[in-house]
């Protein structure tokens, strides 16, 4: 979505995105960041796969920040978000600053999407609605990332955000 790399697989199919990809992304300020797209969060994995996924997810611990991409059209959006938060806490990444990208916004009418965004903002979450298919919300997400990094650097007193 952010790297605009058309070779990346995006399918609504179980285990379609098992590989981790890293891409450089230029933000509106000119700053370049490295984004890592990891495996998604899957509930009720067979026990044999849990260890393999955990190893991949534990790499998240070294991240300066997280962009959590959620399917805005999913009927169980808040349950999925809860699973993500629980998993992040379990692997020691619960305190890493994060932004939410509510993808597939093109599949929702404006009112339900606004309700979701308002609910998340009211709970203190930084969120932006996006559509990878239409490209909508991507400039706003990049602006939010830029502002977020500036705020994080100012708060930490550092020029670079590192873990």
What are these regions (language model features)?
Residues 106-160:
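Canonical P-loop GTPase G-domain recognition
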Residues 44-47, 71-76, 129-133:
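Short, contiguous acidic/charged loop-to-helix segments that flank catalytic cores in large enzymes
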Residues 1-50, 57, 61, 65:
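Conserved G1/Walker A P-loop phosphate-binding module
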Residues 30-31, 53-126:
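Conserved C-terminal guanine-recognition region of P-loop GTPase G domains, centered on the G4
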Residues 11-12, 27, 32-36, 43-47, ...:
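Extended hydrophobic-aromatic, low-complexity segments
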Residues 37, 103, 131:
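Active-site glycine-centered loops adjacent to acidic/histidine catalytic or metal-binding residues
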């Amino acid at each position: 979505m952010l790297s605009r790399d058309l070779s990346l697989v995006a399918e609504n199919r179980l285990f379609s995105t098992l590989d981790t990809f890293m891409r450089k992304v230029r933000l509106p300020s000119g700053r370049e960041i490295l984004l890592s797209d990891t495996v998604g969060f899957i509930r009720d994995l067979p026990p044999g796969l849990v260890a393999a996924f955990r190893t991949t997810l534990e790499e998240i611990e070294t991240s300066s920040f997280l962009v959590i991409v959620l399917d805005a059209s999913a009927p169980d959006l808040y349950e999925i978000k809860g699973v993500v938060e629980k998993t992040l806490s379990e692997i020691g990444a619960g305190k890493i600053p994060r932004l939410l990208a509510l993808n597939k916004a093109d599949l929702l009418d404006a009112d339900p999407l606004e309700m979701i965004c308002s609910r998340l903002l009211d709970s203190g979450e930084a969120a932006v609605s996006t559509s990878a298919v239409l490209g909508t919300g991507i400039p706003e997400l990049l602006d939010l990332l830029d502002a977020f990094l500036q705020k994080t650097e100012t708060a930490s007193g550092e020029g670079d955000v590192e873990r």
